[in-house]
Structure formats: structure tokens, C-alpha cells
């Protein structure tokens, strides 16, 4: 709990004083860890600047006592806890990025970017995706990642993710309902 509070305070400081004023820290704890109950039930105000995630396997889920499982489900419903299925690449465990969208080898990195569909004309969407992905791939090599040895080099690990936002705005602009879209 103490380490979580330190990381929460650090993230608050970086978010408020940093150049980009953003950042995210996700604390992960395996469901098999003896402190999982305390991790799940720590009040949001005790860790306001971090997200919490419980890593599970089918075995750990089955081994978890019913009361702790209920607390975990309650925390997920409240938006205080994320759930992450443990993944492996061969025999090596791989970890999710902050948003649990991309799974990485140890010391791996990824760059994420989005296309704002709400700012696009319909016919521009394919070009926006192509240009966005090209920018991400070019940027990865320019970040300096890998030069210190702290992270894998871009030649060994070049993971990028291109997502979308603004779908509701795009649909509204073109008069398409969710029912029609789905």
C-alpha cells in the first residue's frame, strides 16, 4: 500500500508539472498474491492518481475465496479495479501496456495514437489510418528507445497501436444511429 501511495503522489506531481501534463501508472497484483484483498479494497481516495489491476488465470480465479471474488467484482463494477488475463508468449509471461491493449515482452515498448473520426470526412478515413500508422512506425525509431539498454531496441521490438475516438460524432454528422451502424 505504501509503494502505491508513493507512485500515486509521483504521478500527480508529473501530471501537474510535466511538459505534457499527462501520464498513467497502473499497479498490477496477481490474484494469487496474499495482499490481493487489501489491494482490492483500498479506497480510491488513498490512491487517486493510479489505476489498479488484478491479474488472473483460471486457476487463480478458482483458488480465490468467494468473498474476495465478490469484492473484486464490486471494485470492477465501480471502475476502481481492472481485470487482466495473464498471457504468455511460449513460456515467457508478457505484460499489458497501461491500457491493456498491447501485450509486451519484458522491457518492450509501444507507441499509441488515435484517429479522431469526428474530425474526418468519411472518404478521408482510409488515408487517416494509413498516415497515422506510418507516423507511428517512423516515430518509434526516433524516440531513442533502446539506446540506453533499458528497453529493447526498435529493431527488436517495434509495437504500435492505432485506435479511434470520435465515432459518435462521425455517426451523428452523417445521420447514422447506433442501431443502423451495428
What are these regions (language model features)?
Residues 1-3, 14-17, 75-174:
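Function-dense linear segments that define catalytic or interfacial modules
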Amino acid at each position: 500500500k505504501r509503494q502505491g501511495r508513493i507512485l500515486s503522489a509521483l504521478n500527480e506531481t508529473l501530471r501537474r508539472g510535466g511538459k505534457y501534463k499527462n501520464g498513467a501508472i497502473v499497479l498490477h497484483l496477481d490474484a494469487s498474491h496474499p495482499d490481493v484483498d487489501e489491494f482490492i479494497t483500498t479506497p480510491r481516495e488513498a490512491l487517486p492518481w493510479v489505476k489498479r489491476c488484478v491479474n488472473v488465470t483460471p486457476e487463480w480465479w478458482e483458488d480465490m475465496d468467494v468473498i474476495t471474488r465478490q469484492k473484486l467484482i464490486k471494485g470492477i463494477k465501480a471502475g476502481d479495479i481492472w481485470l487482466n488475463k495473464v498471457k504468455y508468449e511460449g513460456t515467457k509471461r508478457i505484460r499489458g501496456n497501461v491500457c491493456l491493449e498491447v501485450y509486451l515482452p519484458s522491457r518492450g515498448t509501444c507507441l499509441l495514437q488515435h484517429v479522431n473520426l469526428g474530425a474526418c470526412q468519411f472518404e478521408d478515413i482510409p488515408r487517416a489510418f494509413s498516415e497515422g500508422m506510418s507516423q507511428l512506425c517512423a516515430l518509434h525509431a526516433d524516440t531513442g528507445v533502446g539506446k540506453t539498454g533499458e528497453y529493447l531496441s526498435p529493431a527488436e521490438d517495434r509495437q504500435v497501436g492505432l485506435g479511434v475516438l470520435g465515432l459518435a460524432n462521425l455517426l451523428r454528422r452523417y445521420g447514422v444511429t447506433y442501431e443502423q451502424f451495428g
